[in-house]
Each structure stands twice: as structure tokens, then as C-alpha cells.
Swiss-Prot record:
Subunit structure and binding partners: Component of the BCR(KBTBD4) E3 ubiquitin ligase complex, at least composed of CUL3, KBTBD4 and RBX1.
Annotated ranges, domain BACK: 147-239
Gene symbol of the encoding locus: KBTBD4
Described function: Substrate-specific adapter of a BCR (BTB-CUL3-RBX1) E3 ubiquitin ligase complex which targets CoREST corepressor complex components RCOR1, KDM1A/LSD1 and HDAC2 for proteasomal degradation. RCOR1 is likely to be the primary target while degradation of KDM1A and HDAC2 is likely due to their association with RCOR1. Also targets RCOR3, MIER2 and MIER3 for proteasomal degradation as well as associated proteins ZNF217 and RREB1. Degradation is dependent on the presence of an ELM2 domain in the target proteins.
Entries under Pfam families matching the protein: BACK, BTB, Kelch_2
Keywords from the named record: Kelch repeat, Repeat
Record-given protein name: Kelch repeat and BTB domain-containing protein 4
Organism for this UniProt entry: Pongo abelii
The organism's place on the tree of life at top rank: Eukaryota
Positions annotated as Kelch repeat: 239-285, 286-328, 331-378, 380-430, 432-481
Domain BTB per the UniProt entry, residue ranges: 45-112
Amino acid sequence: MESPEEPGASMDENYFVNYTFKDRSHSGRVAQGIMKLCLEEELFADVTISVEGREFQLHRLVLSAQSCFFRSMFTSNLKEAHNRVIVLQDVSESVFQLLVDYIYHGTVKLRAEELQEIYEVSDMYQLTSLFEECSRFLARTVQVGNCLQVMWLADRHSDPELYTAAKHCAKTHLAQLQNTEEFLHLPHHLLTDIISDGVPCSQNPTEAIEAWINFNKEEREAFAESLRTSLKEIGENVHIYLIGKESSRTHSLAVSLHCAEDDSISVSGQNSLCHQITAACKHGGDLYVVGGSIPRRMWKCNNATVDWEWCAPLPRDRLQHTLVSVPGKDAIYSLGGKTLQDTLSNAVIYYRVGDNVWTETTQLEVAVSGAAGANLNGIIYLLGGEENDLDFFTKPSRLIQCFDTETDKCHVKPYVLPFAGRMHAAVHKDLVFIVAEGDSLVCYNPLLDSFTRLCLPEAWSSAPSLWKIASCNGSIYVFRDRYKKGDANTYKLDPATSAVTVTRGIKVLLTNLQFVLA
């Protein structure tokens, strides 16, 4: 008589008789094999697409897998479902070649001169990922010369992110646009949306409205009253704060700067702070600083009244931590830093502005201090700083840590920064501009996981120990961390063209900058 099997024995024995084998690389290998047959050996083409006289030998299966437009075409009762040759009229041959490259290879070289056509055609052919990337590219490169055209385009394609970027450019450069053909032919509803969104007084929006009406007065006079009623003018606000010290004083100073569109920068205010500022950020129109004789204390400077108010202190003392504003949650996050015992911290806490309360949340993957921080769509990018080595001594860090404020989860990017140690960062659209020790200025694109090193003027070759950076009015401003008294020259970088201009003659008392906030 056979003895009963012990639990789990039959599974072990059956392993030698039969089992299910799952090849985890099978799907990828099949896809590679199909694409090799289609591309390298040019086999099994079953449809010819004719564009401007050029014929593309393609595959219905591949086109349908990537595009709902082609899938519907080939599975419908239309003649295109059965025809061997299909003629497309709404796309140029060069742009269709780019679409074919994308559909078959997953890569495409986007060129500025063809970008708007690729944007429109990728939406028409329902290539969603390509359409979204074109939208991001257009939003990054929108400028005075094309903002109205891009705004019109985004409106037609129901693209709110691109529309907002183009509208912001239009309303802040309205004085330059008001006599252009694009502005004078602008549809009424787009003009209304621009002027009702808050146009700076310096852009003379009333003159722009009159110019638009007078271009076709007979038909547009009826809109005059509604346009004047819709107009919302806003004053010029302070955009950048410098926090630092004068060589002869121990107290920190907060200097507010007004950055005008004509590249001029003027000092619009100055306030005395406490002895030692350990962290600072700008949230909305207010300035928040942490430090003083008790390092956990926090103050807010109300920009409207220029009064300092005490806020709830941090739960514990921290030095060299990073403060980052997250407007979408109306919160300020404090990340990393050092304890008073000089131990690196991986703590993350956030301050709910409306409730005046600090709350602890999950920790960083790696404890760091003195890192640069940048908020991009609710994700905080913590860049560089100092971390512990294997012997628990500190070393310059090249890590990029990403803290998601929606999920309260942190992860470290699988790649590192092109430089290490202390750095400063500013967000422009969906890019992070990073300046480090020496003459390094890098544009980091988190969506593409790419870095671009920017060319800088020769003046940067004699760089100080560290530069500071801020994003304001669609430009990147770069400041020295040390100045001679009364010498506060700064550089202004246009992200769209990489052109650099120098702003001279800012009269401030600061000789040592600690923070630059925008």
C-alpha cells in the first residue's frame, strides 16, 4: 500500500513530469522579429501609402497597432480598407516620413520648422505620445514671434497646457504684438481670453484693444464695450528676492527686485532678517524663511504689507535643509538637512499654509543636506548636496531624488547628475535649469531624462564658488554668490534662444548671497 503524499510532494514530483514554461522575453523577441522582417528585409508589405507622389511600402498591422486612425481605416467598410494604394492629401511627404520613423522605430527628430505640422498631423492620426511630446516642445519654445499662432493652434486641438503657455506669452508681450498681422486677425474669443487673464499695465492693453477694433471697425465696433469690460489689468509685482548679508553686518537682509521686460532690474524693497537663515522659499506672493537663534523658527514676510509674521515652528531643529513651495497643495516642504549633532537627515515634513501646521511624512531614500530643490508638477526634484559615503563621512552627491507629493513616495533616478555637490536650481516650464560650482549651467529635462550643457559667456570662466539662479518672466536670471559692494551685475538667459544679456548697475548692499528666490 502506497503511503500518503506529504503536502507539497506532488508539486515537486510533477516538476519532472510536466510544468508550464513561460518565456518572459517571448513578446519582446516576437516584436523584434516582426520589425526586423518589416524594416530590414522589407517583407510582407501589404499597403502602399502615396504622399505627394512618393510611395511608402508599409504594413497594415504595424500602422493599426500604433494608430487608431489607421485601425479604423483598415477595419471599416470604406474603400481604403480594401485598396492596395491609399493617397493621403493632408500631410507633406517630409512630415509623413517622420511619422513612419516614429511608428516603426519609436524615435523621431523634431525640428522647429516642422513642429506645428507634426503636432497637427499626429493629432489627426491619433499618435497620442507623439502629439503630447510636440505639445511639450511647443510650450517650451513658445515666444513672441509665434505665441498667437500657437495659441490658435492649441485652441483648435483642445490642448489646455499648450494654450496656457502661449496665452501667458501673449499677455506679457501684448505691446509688441498689437500691430502684428497675427494679432489684428485674432478671433474675438481668443482676444477676450487674453485680456481677461490679467495683463500687466506696462503692456498698454487698452491700446491693443483699440488697434484690434480699428483694424475692422465696421464689424468689430460691436465688441468694444464687452472687451473693455473684460479687460483686467494688473500692476507690476516683485518677482525675485535676494537673501544675503552685507560684509559689515551679521544680520541677513531680504532685498526685493523688480525685473522688467526691457531687461532692467531695480530694487523695490529691503528688510532686515535674523542672524542666520538656514532655509527659505517663496510661496505665492510671500517669502518664508527658517533660522535664527533657534533654527526651527519660521517667519513669513507678507508682500502686500511688508510685515513679518511668526509661523508654526518646525517640529525639530534642522540645518541646511531644502524648502520647496508646492502651490498645488498650498504647502511648503522641508527635505533632508542636518541635525544639530551634524548628522545627515532623510526626514520630509510639510507645512500646510492655510492651517499653519507642520506634518511629518515618508522619508527620502538617501539622507542629504544642502541639496537644490525644484517642484515640477507636484514632484520635488532634490539635486546634489552632500550624502554619506561608506565610512559615514560626507561626500558631494550626484543623486537625483524624486519625491511625489501626491503619493508621498520617494525614488532615486537610475542615472546621476553631470556634476556633484552644492548647486542651485530653477524651474522653467517643464525644464529644470541647474547651476553648480565653477561655470556649469545645465538644462535638465526630467521627461526625457536628458541633460544639455549650455554655452556661457567668457565672463563665467572667472566664476565664483557658486552662482544662484531664478526663473522669472520667462527668462533665467543668474547671480553671483559674492559681489563687491555696489556691484550687482547679473546675467539673463533666454531659454528659447540661449541668448545671454548682462544687466548692470543694480545698487544693493548685499555682498554675499545665501538664497535667490522667484
